[in-house]
UniProtKB/Swiss-Prot annotation:
Its cofactor is thiamine diphosphate. GO terms for biological process: branched-chain amino acid catabolic process. It comes from Acholeplasma laidlawii. This is Pyruvate dehydrogenase E1 component subunit alpha. It holds the Pfam family E1_dh. NCBIfam families: PDH_E1_alph_x. It catalyses: N(6)-[(R)-lipoyl]-L-lysyl-[protein] + pyruvate + H(+) = N(6)-[(R)-S(8)-acetyldihydrolipoyl]-L-lysyl-[protein] + CO2. CDD domains: TPP_E1_PDC_ADC_BCADC. The gene is pdhA. Its EC number is 1.2.4.1. The pyruvate dehydrogenase complex catalyzes the overall conversion of pyruvate to acetyl-CoA and CO(2). It contains multiple copies of three enzymatic components: pyruvate dehydrogenase (E1), dihydrolipoamide acetyltransferase (E2) and lipoamide dehydrogenase (E3). The lineage of its organism: Bacteria, Bacillati, Mycoplasmatota, Mollicutes, Acholeplasmatales.
Amino acid sequence: DQNGKVVNEKMEPKLPKETLLKMYKTAVLGRNADIKALQYQRQGRMLTYAPNMGQEAAQIGMAAAMEPQDWNSPMYRELNTLLYRGDKLENVFLYWYGNERGSIKPEGVKILPTNIIIGSQSNIAAGLAMASKIRKTNEVTAFTIGDGGTAHGEFYEGLNFAASFKAPVVAVIQNNQWAISTPVRKASNSETLAQKGVAFGIPYIQVDGNDMLAMYVASKEAMDRARKGDGPTLIEAFTYRMGPHTTSDDPCSIYRTKEEENEWAKKDQIARFKTYLINKGYWSEEEDKKLEEEVLAEINDTFKKVESYGANVELIEIFEHTYAEMTPQLKEQYEEHKKYLEGVK
């Protein structure tokens, strides 16, 4: 429940202590990184940023249910998924700093570059999952999308394809109640966003997106279903975007109230999960204080390193990390762009 107490022990996943602590520590790192990134941007030290505050459980619960061989086709509000699955905070900061190297994932981390075009992650996920099915690699591809993103055509195209061919896809709608400044009640006439799965003929479920364990259970069931060859599942994580859409807006002065934010703040998932861990004897207030100090030091050190790199990259780097080897078309585009830049100089 909202106080971190297990309501139904039969539904509680039997996760090892190490996994539960990794979930919590990732959430604490993600929350603090969000807060600091907003500060860096306001100080003119970062181009822009899309914070994840309030959506940690929805992201980490899904990520924890994935196997190492599985793929993510991420949206731009996906910090905690990236961190949990092995991407570096340095890469995330580089990306929002404007350095293309931020899109280069560590070796063995099966995460695609961030999708800025809303809805595009659905088609990419469907195609990647279909390739996995054809190659019999036992991989599942997961993607998340915001409530506003479900109004975009590519969301439907990708899921319809995946459903038709039973491609191993798990789709998670992070329903954070706001599509920039449009409330979800004005963006869709559906009682829930989960029920959009009816049209695809696939299983669907609405989950408390602030309950990390509920998100894990729903995601694990969906991953297992996809891995068995039963096709996609649509999960709606009912949650709330505590921060602005990006650093370019100010929600409370434009389109929502402080009272609304305060009500959702009472449901904070990190405090909820912390209480759960303390009740299980896995965590303490002393350890929590130490973690906060370590996390803040890590964030500050990481951003100093990012600033030392700057935003400059070699032109070739933009082209050579799309495929294992550059295709003839990419090589041609690289040479063409190189000549253009030389002409500009």
